[in-house]
Curated annotation (Swiss-Prot):
Identification of the protein by name: Uncharacterized protein MJ1680
Pfam family, one: PIN_3
PANTHER family assigned to the protein according to its UniProt record, in alphabetical order: SSL7007 PROTEIN
Gene3D superfamilies tied to this protein: 5'-nuclease (3.40.50.1010)
Organism, as annotated: Methanocaldococcus jannaschii (strain ATCC 43067 / DSM 2661 / JAL-1 / JCM 10045 / NBRC 100440) (Methanococcus jannaschii)
């Protein structure tokens, strides 16, 4: 009998979750990034998300927290290597902040959870923390909500 492979949770983390994880690796976003690097969850992303993350991480404002450019580029390369990079075919326009639509597009195509602290994305979810698009329900937890549920899931 074949051994069943564990199903891994698919996620899309927004830029602020990634940056928060780098600034405070011991915080909740840091735990999420650890889960991605340990390949306990699968992160889905896109070239436009990676570009935004890179742009923000390399900004002078954040470099004082994140270190020199070489260190940041190594982290971004490592993050890319453990992520599934897709080019979504969908192009939803449901967010007040148009830049946030890219997270929805990736999550929709990959059937992933969007982990975010972004107020615009959170405002789109229903009372059960789901965003419904074209009969697809995308879970949209905050980092804290995700970790709480993940810990229940694995225990």
């Amino acid at each position: 009998m074949e051994k069943m492979e564990k199903i891994k949770i698919k996620v899309v983390i927004d830029t602020n979750v990634f940056i928060s994880a780098l600034i405070n690796p011991n915080g909740i976003p840091g735990k999420i990034l650890d889960l991605i690097f340990e390949e306990k969850i699968v992160n889905y992303t896109s070239p436009s998300i990676l570009k935004e993350i890179g742009f923000k991480c390399l900004s002078p404002k954040l470099r004082k927290y994140l270190g020199n450019e070489n260190r940041i580029l190594k982290i971004l390369t490592a993050f890319s290597s453990v992520s599934v990079i897709i080019n979504p075919n969908t192009n939803f326009n449901v967010c007040r902040d148009e830049d946030d639509n890219k997270f929805i597009n990736v999550a929709y195509e990959s059937k992933a959870i969007i982990i975010t602290g972004d107020k615009d994305l959170i405002s789109l979810r229903d009372e059960n923390k789901y965003l419904k698009i074209n009969n697809i329900h995308l879970k949209v937890p905050t980092p804290k909500e995700f970790i709480e549920e993940f810990e229940k899931f694995i225990s």
